[in-house]
């Protein structure tokens, strides 16, 4: 079997867990659950999140690094093996819980148990920026100027660029903020502004 993990004992990492694909996946799951809880409120219930294979590949691949599969080479079946319950590290299951993963046509469903939702609610700091952004875009008459001001409230070092792809009008992102590397893409639908956020690798894949 091809080695797919940085450590021989995947249940008890002896190295730096924070550099692993599992840690990157865990952060993404927690970020999305936080965002959902800010939008909809907290309930101790199962949460199902969907990822394309390409996004999961970005978490687990690092071209040229030891013990990694070359970029673009992890198949759907290999990813299911990586995310098999028997391969999940204790560091992940102690936080987000015993996730269940299924896949079809390179689209993955990651099912987070109620305990994972509870952990995010009770043991992670609130994301004040996301909460304010959600409240702002939900306000009638919200403008891009107000949204830009909100970004500047949290950092003087941001980037804002127009987008000409017909789907979004512009993106804003924080620079030099390692905990928030997302591209926040906005579209003015006339009556309100919507946003989606993308990790840098996914943004590059889309070719916006």
Locations of regions flagged by a protein language model:
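Alpha-helix boundary/N-cap detector
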Residues: 13-28, 51, 74, 87, ...
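Short, non-transmembrane alpha-helical segments in secretory-pathway proteins
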Residues: 28-31, 132-157
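Charge-enriched amphipathic alpha-helical scaffolds
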Residues: 47, 57-100
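Positively charged, polyanion-binding regions of nucleic-acid-associated proteins
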Residues: 8-49, 59, 135
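A cross-family detector of function-defining hotspots
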Residues: 143, 149-184
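Intrinsically disordered, low-complexity regulatory segments enriched in Ser/Thr/Pro
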Residues: 178-208
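Charged low-complexity interaction tracts in eukaryotic proteins
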Residues: 7-20, 81-124, 166-170, 174-177, ...
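Amphipathic alpha-helical segments that form the core helices of the histone-fold
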Residues: 49-59, 169-174
